[in-house]
Amino acid sequence: MKRGVWLLIYCYATLTKGFSLPGLSPTTYHSGDEIPLLVNRLTPSIYFQHQDEEGNDVSGDKEHFLYSYDYYNKRFHFCRPEHVEKQPESLGSVIFGDRIYNSPFQLNMLEEKECVALCKSTIPGKDAKFINTLIKSGFFQNWLVDGLPAARKAYDSRTKTNYYGTGFELGFTDVKQTVDGKAVPSTMEELTSEASNEDVILDARLPKNVKPNLVKTVELPYFVNHFDIEVEFHDRGNDNYRVVGVIVNPVSIERSSPGACSTTGKPLILDEDKDNEVYFTYSVKFVASDTVWATRWDKYLHIYDPQIQWFSLINFSVIVILLSSVVMHSLLRALKSDLARYNELNLDNEFHEDSGWKLGHGDVFRTPSKSMLLSILVGSGMQLFLMVMCSIFFAAVGLVSPVSRGSLPTVMFVLYALFGFVGSYASMGVYKFFRGPYWKANMILTPILLPGAIFLLIVIMNFFLLFAHSSGVIPARSLFFIILLWFLVSVPLSFAGSIVAHKQCNWDEHPTKTNQIARQIPYQPWYLRTAQATLIAGIFSFGSIAVELYFIYSSLWFNKIFYMFGFLLFSFLLLTLTTSLVTILITYYSLCLENWLWQWRSFIIGGLGCSIYTFIHSILFTKFKLGGVITVVLYLGYSLIISALCCVVTGAIGFFSSMFFIRKIYSAIKVE
């Protein structure tokens, strides 16, 4: 058994890294060829804690925003090219907030530059306050050179590895501490001019005679206005070069004229009470590298906390294997005993009294309340399940690569539309299983109800993004394209699936007949009641994806590259297996206690518990301070959407597992 476990782990370990598709051809440059530098949106970075000189955490007033800003937003006053041109992007890239434009930076292969003046910009005090707020919140700039993100070199002390962290700072913060009771200067100019006054600004290592409760933290935001660009290239000979890495070292320098370019000067602090003249400059350096084009992404794709992921997956895999072994052994033994007892014909007795789960044979296939809604949710859940499974699989084997921006969400949209056939087939099949009379209503509502509700919520979130002037606003053209894809592809396929299921699906052929009068359900133990069973079952389902959710949220909210799809695929398979086993087990023991109302219970127990824990996890993920009402609404709104979709997917898994289990066991008994 141990060999099987380790073999399974090894197989999935080979899927933990994606690879580039051969069809993505590299760009070869010659000496002097222009290398386009593109600018993308400004994004929030993952939470970090300020530290003093002794390495101790220092609390600050850092707030975090969960929406991005357009690079050429008027409040930033960045240098613009003569003609700003928006670059073509995929549907997924646009929906996830990418806004890529050309830039005034001039990069030519092997032509190094030193302190080139870019432009002079005047930043009003009102915009300076906005920029300072984003600097304190840890916003990053995102550039692209030859398809590679501009990065900063970073070191992971936990794995003791060097890697390239995508993006670089909009600015830096310097943490100072002030003694309460002393007047803190109201302007940045006064603050820096009095920096030598020890009564006002103290070193991070405070004297022992200063009481801690009198100390306050002040963050000084330094705005970046100089960029040291380092382009790594691979020499292929015969004056052929390929870009294999881009490093940007941002510098904050206060200048009074564009000619001065020392990096050792005073940092630039934007005054929030007056206009600020800012000179933007950049330098370019080319560095030869042995890295070949095919492996240039390896430096960017860094696994954070791999030991935690391996430990959690191995630990939970062992738990699932033990759980499945116990469940299958106990369940199969009990069923074998039950079936042998139920199918015995005692010729000496005129009457034979049923007991256990066989008592529900006349009610277990009874039509539940709101059968239309349940069938639609189950069918939509199956459609989402197949979309998620195939998307993760394609990414794990390398068919979807970070080389192509927005490719994964685009693939997910297309797969969801294509799987409309399967989703509607499942929905109509379940509705026939319930023997519902309004099959045409089911055919119409299945491709509209859940997608329409999600689309409406996204549009509402879009208005909040629009109010915040975020680059994450989905353009009307993209929304129209989604609707077009929906009605021209998904809806026709859904109608076809419903019609095929209505004519060919035989799920309405039940192994037992339904009694005219429903059997009364006796008192149930507390652990089998719906609410308690839901929370208990949800622990097992959520445990299989808890660790991966952290990395997914980090990628979703803080622009981190997520590529550990092998881990994610393994976790999703564990989620599917765990949800199925636990739901079947609870359904079986409920039937043994004559509770034949399994339809809604299997969906709720399989889905609601996991979604509740997922939503709680998303709330606990926000250890940081959310900046503003809009950020809170957006975070809660999108977390609610993710949790609801999780509920539908796992609920469908639980329902279908219970449905096929019940059909199997009741078709194996003889009912007189």
Curated annotation (Swiss-Prot):
Instruction: Give the transmembrane region(s).
Output: 308-328, 384-404, 411-431, 448-468, 480-500, 533-553, 566-586, 602-622, 629-649
Query: Does this UniProt record's set of keywords contain Membrane?
Result: yes
Q: Which residues lie on this side of the membrane: Extracellular?
A: 19-307, 405-410, 469-479, 554-565, 623-628
Does the keyword Ion transport belong to this entry? yes
- Signal peptide segment: 1-18
Please indicate the ranges of residues that lie on the Cytoplasmic side.
329-383, 432-447, 501-532, 587-601, 650-672
Q: List locations, semicolon-separated.
A: Vacuole membrane
Q: Which InterPro entries match?
A: EMP70 (IPR004240)
Identify its membrane topology class: Multi-pass membrane protein
Alphabetically ordered keywords of this record: Ion transport, Membrane, Signal, Transmembrane, Transmembrane helix, Transport, Vacuole
Q: Name one GO cellular component term.
A: endosome
One Pfam family linked to the record: EMP70
Enumerate the Gene Ontology biological process terms. Answer: intracellular copper ion homeostasis; invasive growth in response to glucose limitation; monoatomic ion transport; protein localization to membrane; pseudohyphal growth; vacuolar transport
Family to which this protein belongs:
Belongs to the nonaspanin (TM9SF) (TC 9.A.2) family.
Question: What does this gene product do?
Answer: With EMP70 and TMN3, plays a critical role in the late stages of a nutrient-controlled pathway notably regulating FLO11 gene expression. Acts downstream of RAS2 and TOR. Essential for cell adhesion and filamentous growth. May play a role as effector of cellular copper homeostasis.
Protein name as it appears in the record: Transmembrane 9 superfamily member 2
Q: Which organism is this protein's natural source?
A: Saccharomyces cerevisiae (strain ATCC 204508 / S288c) (Baker's yeast)
Q: What is the lineage of its organism?
A: Eukaryota, Fungi, Dikarya, Ascomycota, Saccharomycotina
